[in-house]
Amino acid sequence: MAAVTAKLVKELRDKTGAGMMDCKKALAATDGDTDKAVEWLRQKGIASAEKKSGRTAAEGSIGSYIHTGARVGVLIEINCETDFVARGDMFQELLRDVSMQVAACPNVEYVTTDEIPPEISEREKAIEMGRDDLEGKPEKMKEKIVEGRIAKRLKELALMEQPFIKDSSITVAELVKQAAGKIGENVKVRRFTRYTLGEGIEVEDNDFAAEVASMQNAG
């Protein structure tokens, strides 16, 4: 298998406009053959998606998903460039898939890691720096370990970083990118809200026997 060098990655990136990680995957899948890698990216819809990512996506649709048992519900907004595409089967399928993804990810709070407020990162850093397993380690090593843990934690909070529930070999970001390439427009997940039945309600846990006794005493 041919080595995937930085030079090959840059060459492919310049040709297609695809992201660095996508270029690496394409070259690895095609044994370092740049022409085949371009075809691989086009088949995945990635090359064309990157070129469209700068265009304004002001149309789209708001989708909903209610999980079996009606205990979890999701509202999500995904944008595209035209109303025609928003009404199409491919876009609507993406809307359903990402809605289901949100329902399956109770810890996800943001669309991307870029949206996570700095204070969240600082809070996570304070928690990690105080962990017992870091005690006695050199400061530079400690910082590096903490940095890795924070990055992992922030990814857990971001929808686009999650493995796609129907195909864990790709992330939600890659799913959206592939859909954009196939649709031929810029596609962007803008926002979402996840509802869990009873969330935030404090349920009083009474002892049934004590409750009966108190009712008798009251009588």
From Swiss-Prot:
UniProt keyword annotations, A-Z: Cytoplasm, Elongation factor, Protein biosynthesis
InterPro entries documented for this protein: EF-Ts_dimer_sf, Transl_elong_EFTs/EF1B, Transl_elong_EFTs/EF1B_dimer, Transl_elong_Ts_CS, UBA-like_sf
GO cellular component labels: cytoplasm
SUPFAM superfamilies cross-referenced by the UniProt entry: Elongation factor Ts (EF-Ts), dimerisation domain (SSF54713), UBA-like (SSF46934)
Cellular compartments annotated: Cytoplasm
Molecular function via GO: translation elongation factor activity
Cysteines paired by S-S bonds: none
Pfam families tied to this protein: EF_TS (PF00889)
Keyword Cytoplasm tagged: yes
Region (Involved in Mg(2+) ion dislocation from EF-Tu): 82-85
Xref: PANTHER family: ELONGATION FACTOR TS (PTHR11741), POLYPROTEIN OF EF-TS, CHLOROPLASTIC (PTHR11741:SF10)
Protein family according to the UniProt entry: Belongs to the EF-Ts family.
Record function comment: Associates with the EF-Tu.GDP complex and induces the exchange of GDP to GTP. It remains bound to the aminoacyl-tRNA.EF-Tu.GTP complex up to the GTP hydrolysis stage on the ribosome.
The name this protein goes by in its record: Elongation factor Ts
Record organism: Synechococcus sp. (strain CC9902)
